[in-house]
């Protein structure tokens, strides 16, 4: 099953066709990352494009790595796996960063995950910016795009 509210669009474009051709020739080289769903089945955390391409290539089975993670960690993992991709629209980044920010804030309540006795405590926005190519200021600006009226978000 796809990730609920997945902010990254899976496009049937030239890049997708190249991925389909590669999968037909070589198979899926990187496993999808999934997690068990309470109602049964699995939810894709990372690999939506590979999954779609595998379907287009006619595969009925694909290898996965199963991770038992909570909602917040699943969001963080999903954003981290996708944010470095090329051809991500500003709105995709905006939605992804906003989702990651909320997940990081939730984890901030769990001191076992965020307390560091030796170093300074990072803000949630600093944690979102860590490990991505955008600065903390850029991350905040992207997140503000979510406040645009829906018609402007589509442009």
Place the predicted regions along the sequence by residue.
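Short, charged/polar connector segments at secondary-structure boundaries
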Residues: 1-67, 73-87
